[in-house]
C-alpha cells in the first residue's frame, strides 16, 4: 500500500513540474511576441529569415541561450560570431529571460513545410 501511495505522489509531483514547465514555455512565447523578436528572428515560416531559431534547442544549452539574451556582445566576442547586425543586450526581467530560454529549448528541429 505504501508503495502505491509513494508512486502516486511521485507522479503528481512530476505532473506539477511538467505543468510549471509548460507554463514557462507559454510565457516564453508571449515574451517572444511582446519583445517583437520576429523582427530579427524566424521560427518556421514566421519572422525574419536572417536570424533563424529553428533547431536552436539542439544547438545551444540553456546557459548559452541565457548568455546570448543578457550579454550578446560578450557572446559575439566569445564565439567569434560574424553575424550582422549584432543582437543587442536586452534588459529583461530574469523571469522573462528564463521563460524565453525554456521556449527556445523546445525548438528542437526545423518545422516541416
Question: At which residue positions do the language-model features occur?
Answer:
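Axial heme c-ligation environment in periplasmic c-type cytochrome domains
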Residues: 48-57, 71-99, 104-107, 112
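Short pre-active-site segment immediately N-terminal to redox-active cysteine/selenocysteine motifs
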Residues: 33-36, 44, 86, 96
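Gly/Gly-Pro-rich "capping" loops immediately C-terminal to redox-active cysteine motifs
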Residues: 25-29, 39-71, 88-89
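Electrostatic cytochrome c docking/interface patches
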Residues: 14-33
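Bacterial N-terminal signal peptides
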Residues: 5-15
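Hydrophobic packing within well-folded, soluble alpha/beta domains
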Residues: 37-40, 100
Amino acid at each position: 500500500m505504501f508503495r502505491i501511495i509513494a508512486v502516486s505522489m511521485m507522479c503528481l509531483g512530476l505532473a506539477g513540474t511538467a505543468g510549471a514547465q509548460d507554463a514557462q514555455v507559454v510565457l516564453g512565447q508571449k515574451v517572444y511576441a511582446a519583445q517583437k523578436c520576429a523582427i530579427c528572428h524566424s521560427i518556421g515560416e514566421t519572422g525574419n529569415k536572417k536570424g533563424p531559431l529553428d533547431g536552436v534547442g539542439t544547438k545551444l544549452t540553456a546557459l548559452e541561450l541565457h548568455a546570448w539574451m543578457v550579454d550578446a556582445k560578450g557572446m559575439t566576442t566569445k564565439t567569434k560570431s560574424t553575424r550582422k547586425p549584432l543582437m543587442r543586450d536586452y534588459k529583461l526581467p530574469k523571469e522573462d529571460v528564463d521563460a524565453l530560454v525554456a521556449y527556445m529549448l523546445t525548438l528542437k528541429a526545423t518545422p516541416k513545410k
